[in-house]
Amino acid sequence: MHEDLLSPKLQLLQTGFPERLVKLPQNAQVAWREAGDASSDFAVVLLHGISSGAASWLDVALQLGDKARVLAWDAPGYGVSTPLAPAAPADADYAQALAQSLLVLGVRRCLLVGHSLGALMAARLAVTVAPGLVEQLVFISPAGGYGAAAKAEQQAKVREGRLAALAEKGVAGLAAVIDQRLVSSEAPEAVRAWVRWNTARMQPQGYAQAVELLCGSDLAQAQGRLGMPVQVWVGEHDVVTPPAACKAWSELLGAHYGTLAAAGHASPVEQPVEVAHRLASLLNQSYLPNTS
C-alpha cells in the first residue's frame, strides 16, 4: 500500500524537482533539487529539518516553479550530500556549505526559508556568513537550539536521547514512527508515508552531526542582527515547536508571525499549497528579478 502511495510522488520528484550535484572543495558534494528558471540569479532557497530532506519540499516547489527559481538542498550528511568534516559541526559550517553551493549555482539573491533545524542554518547565513544574499527570511516552525548556557542541562538530555534512539532503532526505526509527531492527527496516509520516506533517506553520520548542530546553536543570537524582513510561521497543531514558542521567537526577532491551519510540524508536506501561497505572496512584494 505504501508503495502505491509513494510511486506517483517519486515520479513527480524525478520529473518536476530533479536532483543535481554541486561540487565543493575537498571533494565534497551537495545534492540539490531544482524547479523553475535555472538561469535566474534569484531563487527561493528551502532548507529542511533534522529528520527530513530536500524532497520534502516537492509539493511546495511544484506550486512555485512557474513563479521563481526554487532550490532545496539535502544538507551535508543527508541523502547523497557529503557529511561535514567536523564530528560536531556548528551552524556556521552548514552556512558556509550553503553559501558555497549557492555561489556555484549562480544565486546572488534569495528568499531563504528554514524549516525547523533549517532555521538555525538560515539564521547563521543571514547574520554573518552571507547576509547580502538574503532579501527576505522565513522560519517555519523554527528550532531554537540548545546552545545557550542556560540550556546546558537540556542540551545534554537532548543529545543523549537523540543519539541513543539512533543507536537503538537505526534510521529505519526512526523513520517508521516519525510521522506520529510531525503531522496533525488528520493528516492522510499519503502525507505520512512521504514524511517517513524522507526520514528513511537520512545518513546516520549526518543525523548525528545535525544533533550536534541542534545542541550547539542558539537562534537567540540572531536577535537584532537580521537586516531583512523576517517571517515566523508554525502549524497550529505543531507539538515539536508549538505555536506559543514560535510566537515568542517572532517577538524576539521582530518578525511577522502567522499560523498554518490543519498542520503539524511538517507543514510544508501537510499543507504545501498554503505554504507556497504565502511564499508567492512574498515574491509579489518586488523580490523577483527586474525584467524591465
Segments (PLM) and residue ranges:
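Alpha/beta-hydrolase fold catalytic core
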Residues: 1-44, 65-68, 107-108, 280-292
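Conserved HGGG/HGGXW glycine-rich cap/lid loop of the alpha/beta-hydrolase fold
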Residues: 28-83
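Conserved acidic catalytic loop of the alpha/beta-hydrolase fold
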Residues: 93-110
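Gly/Ala-rich beta-loop-alpha elbow adjacent to hydrolase catalytic centers
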Residues: 114, 118-122
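Flexible "cap/lid" loop of the alpha/beta hydrolase fold
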Residues: 123-128, 132-167
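Conserved alpha/beta-hydrolase catalytic His-Asp/Glu region
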Residues: 150-156, 167-224
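Conserved loop-alpha-helix segment in the C-terminal half of the alpha/beta-hydrolase fold
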Residues: 227-263, 269
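Catalytic active-site module of serine/aspartate enzymes centered on a nucleophile-bearing elbow/loop
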Residues: 254-292
